[in-house]
Structures are given as C-alpha cells and as structure tokens.
Amino acid sequence: MLTNLHVKNLALIDEAEVEFGPGLNILTGETGAGKSILIGSINAALGKKISREMIRTGETSALVELVFETENPHVLELLKEMDLEAEEGQVIISRKITGSRSVCRINGEACNISQVKVLASLLLDIHGQHEHQTHDVRQGKTPGRIETVAHAGAAQQRAEIIADGLA
C-alpha cells in the first residue's frame, strides 16, 4: 500500500507531502489544483518518462519519493533477488530528475528504471478518469456496434443489434 508521497520542485509544486490511508484513496479538487501533477509525479517515480521541463522554474532538480508498506511475498522475494532489503515491509522508491539525467533508488540503493517498473507492477495500480472506456466519441473513434446502433432507424433494429452484440 502506498502510504506517502513526497514531491519537491516538480512543475508548480515547491514541496508537497501526501499521506495515504488504507483502502481507496481519491484525489479531488478544483481545476488547476495540482491533481494531475501529483499523479504524474507518482508515475514518474514508478518509471514513466518525464520531461526535464517539468523541473520547477529556477530549480536544478526535482525529486519524487514514494513510501510503500507491503507484506506481499512476491514483492519481498523480488527485493531479495535485487539484493535489497525491505525493513519491516517498507519500500521507498525515489527518483531525482536533473537537466541531464535522472537517478532512481529503491530503499536508498541506486537502480535502473526497468527494476523500478517491475517492482511498481507489484505495488500499485493507478486508474484515471475514463481509462475503462474503449472509445472517444469526440474524436469519432467509436466501436462499430455503437455507430451501427446510432444509425439504426427503428427501435427493433437497435434492440436486435444490441442483443446480437451480447450473444
């Protein structure tokens, strides 16, 4: 479970600390409050590409640190394979981004992005708004059945098309 997020000098964030509790955690707020930056910082720490331009204006580096608590045997075994220890089930993943490179660490030990990505796949799932949808009506990208239903003239035809799709 992700218990803590620390972000420093990333985008508009000078420094931020977010504590997470057990169960579902939801970020809400006004437009422009920084929700996307927080999610982006988590993704960056977990190995996603991040532009150097995301470093806060006037700063030379940005830092994102995630703290996890886990008893997952797969995570603990993977850490052993990487010659890393998880004291009391705590895993700390950090990434420092500078103008020329980024450095990842797991529990204080330097590692590569691929190691972080493998570990991250066992620790966290992030689901954003509309990720479950398979179409984008605004851009005209819709599955064939939806287009067919939209253009069917009679209610009976629409019902048959839907029934066929469910069969």
Region locations from a protein language model:
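Gly/Lys-enriched N-terminal cap/neck module of very large, oligomeric protein machines
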Residues: 4-166
